From Swiss-Prot:
SUPFAM superfamilies recorded: HLH, helix-loop-helix DNA-binding domain (SSF47459), PYP-like sensor domain (PAS domain) (SSF55785)
Coiled coil: none
Positions of the PAC domain: 348-392
Protein name (database record): Aryl hydrocarbon receptor nuclear translocator homolog
Single GO biological process annotation from the record: neurogenesis
Chief location of this protein within or outside the cell: nucleus
Gene3D superfamilies per the UniProt record, alphabetical: Helix-loop-helix DNA-binding domain (4.10.280.10), PAS domain (3.30.450.20)
Top-rank taxon, per record: Eukaryota
PANTHER family in the cross-refs: CIRCADIAN PROTEIN CLOCK/ARNT/BMAL/PAS
Keywords attached to this entry: Developmental protein, DNA-binding, Nucleus, Receptor, Repeat, Transcription, Transcription regulation
Amino acid sequence: MAQDIFMDPWQSATSFAMEDEDMGMPSGKYARMEDEMGENKERFARENHSEIERRRRNKMTHYINELAEMVPQCASLGRKPDKLTILRMAVSHMKGIRGHTAQDETSYKPSFLTDQELKHLILEAANGFLFVVCCQTGKVLYVADSITPVLNLKQEDWLQRNLNELIHPDDQDKIRDQLCGSEVSVNKVLDLKSGSVKREGASTRVHMSCRRGFICRMRVGALEPLHRLRNRRPLFQHAGQNYVVMHCTGYIKNAPPQGINAPASSCLVAIARLQVASMPVCADPTSTNQFSVRVSEDGKMTFIDARVSDLIGLSSDQLIGRYWWNLAHPADEKTLQDSFVALLSDQPMRINIRVRTSTDYIPCTVSAYKFMNPYSEQFEYVVATHQIAPQEDINNWVTAPTVPQPQASEFGELGGAPSAVDYGQSSSGGWRPEAQGAPQAQWQWDPMNGYNQ
C-alpha cells in the first residue's frame, strides 16, 4: 500500500514528457514560448518607456522655450540660450520680482503729491506715449492721451488708422519688418542728418524674441500751439507734413483667438519717446535772449546753442573748439576762467560778464553747473547758460569785481571793442588781432580750409 502512494519525482517528470511526446508536442516548445513572450514583454516595456520619455522631453523643451520668451534677460540675448542658462535667468528674474514686491510701493511717491499729479510728472518726464498696433492689419488699436503734449495730436487722430499713414513714407518698410516678425531682413539705417534711409546689403537675424526697438519719424500736429514742437530738432517735412524722430520700445503680444477656426493674431505694444537729440538743449525754450554752451574739462566749447548766431552774430561753427573764456571781454577772461576752475571744485557759479559779438561787447549773466555721469560718477561736461541783459538794464550793468592784468587778448587790444578783422585766422589756426589799418573783412567759411577772410 505504501509503495503505491510513493512516486519518484524523476519518474513523474519522465512520464509527463512521454505523454507530451505521445500527443505530438516536443518537450522544449513550452520553454521557447515562454522565452519569446518574456522577450516581447521586455521590448514592449522598453519602447513604451522610450515613448514616454520622448514626450516628456518634448513638453519640457516647449515649456522652457516659453519661459525664455517671458524672461527679459533671455529675450535680450543675441543667441538662443541653453536650457540651464534659461532656468538660471528665470530664477534670477523671479528673485528680482519678489524683491521689488516686498518693498512698500507707497515709498516711491512723495506724500505731498496726489496720484494725478504724480501721473502728470511721470508723463512729462517720459516725454512719450503708449500705443498698440495690430500686426496683421497695421491699425492702431489704442493710444494714450499723453500723445497730445508730445505730438500735438488727439487720440482720435490715431485710433483705427493705419500706422503707415502716421509715419514718414521712408520708414514704412522698417515698421512692416517690425510688425511681421520676419527672421531675415535687410538692414536699414536712418540717417538723422539727411532724413534718408540707408540700406545695407548684408542680411541678418533681426528678431530673436518678441521684444522690439526701433527709431522712426512720426507725424506731428501744428507747430504753433506748443513751444516744445517749435524747438524740436530735427524736423522733417514731406508732402506738407512735419515729422519728428521718435524712439519706440515694446514687445509683440499674442492675442487670444476669437473663435475655434479664427486665425491667430498679435499686436505690438510699445512706448514712443522723443529722441534725446531732438529736444532743445536750453532749459527754457521760450526764452529768446539766452543761449547754452557745453564745455569740456579742458575749458573748450564742444556744443553751442544754435540761437547764438541771432544773439551775438557768431555761428556755433565759429566758436566750437575754442576756449570758453575767449568768448568774454578781455577784462573778464580771468574772472570767467577762475570761476570755471572753482566750478570744477564743486563751487556754485553765477557771474556777470561781457561777451563778444561780431561788432561789440554786450553784458550777460552766466550761470553754470557741472554734469556728472550718474553711473560712473565721473565728470562729463559743464553746461553754461548765457542770459543776455535787456537793453534797458545795460546802463545799470555791473560786472563781477576783478582787476584784470594789462595783457593783450587773442581777440584784440585790451578793453577795445572787437572788429571784424579780429577774427582773421593765422596759419596756425588760432584767432589773432590783425595789424592796425588793415582792411575790414568778414568771416567766410571754407569747408576745406576753415575760416578765411
